[in-house]
Amino acid sequence: MGENTRPFPIQPWVGEGKLSQKMLGEIITWKIQGVAISHADLLSGLMASDLDCDVAKELAPRNAFARACSKLDSERIIRKIAEDHATITFQFTREANEGGKFHYYFESLLFLNKYSGSITSENLELEQLAKEEFGRCMEARTANDVTRLVQRLFERHADLFSIRDQGGVYFVPEVHNDFIVKVERFVRNIGGSLQRFPIPAGSPQGDRAVQEAVAHGLQAIIDEHLQAVQKFGEDTRPDTLRRAEEKIRTTKMKIEGYSFYLDKKREDLEASLQQASELLRSRMSFLIGAPSEEAELVLV
């Protein structure tokens, strides 16, 4: 950086209270060191930061199992062949080079419970081997696991609005400032870092950028609602329909809560959410036999 003898523009404000203007929120980004973090250290960090420890239990077993498979695939091929709401089924196939040609022999199917992490197989030797490696991978969490954990914390207790299409940099509304402090403490407790960049209101560029980030993030949520409802069919469970209804209700509350940022974009978002609501009402009417007008959706 070259030498600059001009006064730094913010310098005269320091100590005079001129920075205490209304804040829109903060742009945050975090970095987790690329070393394995024990499950115990994660729990300790969450507890010390007064954060929800249950999210550590929700780190998907499938991610740990994928890492375990990389240790188990010597001379075998492992493929996912089926998945339902609770279980993923994998096929283990032994690969052998015989007479200059590869031959493939079915070994066994292995079943992974997506929630409990339990592993079962008719091949008890393979089951035990998979359990041992899976246990090691569940205990040692990666930086990607921690990033998903942080995102899950915000999903439960606040909101992250992506600034970049690639992710990694987010806007967090000012109302969640206290929660950012807790997450920052947690990230530092486990050896990472979290950078915070406060965004004051009143700058045309800043106001517009925040508005676009919040509107884009909310529209992405609505698009997810639409895509999910469009896939609902005769095998869709009633509790799945009710969860979709609750998600739409929650999104409506978010649009209302963040109306300060949205201005005229609020109308577009409400119209888009209305479309998702009407589609869900129609599907509920067809699937559970209730008249369309009796589907108790928050948007009518």
Which stretches of residues belong to each language-model region?
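Non-Sec secretion/translocation targeting segments of pathogen effectors
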Residues: 1-3, 299-300
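Terminal interaction module
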Residues: 2, 37-57, 63-70, 140-148, ...
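Charge-rich, low-complexity segments
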Residues: 2-126, 130, 134
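C-terminal accessory extensions appended to soluble enzyme cores
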Residues: 126-127, 219-300
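Active-site nucleotide-donor binding segment shared across nucleotidyl transfer reactions
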Residues: 151
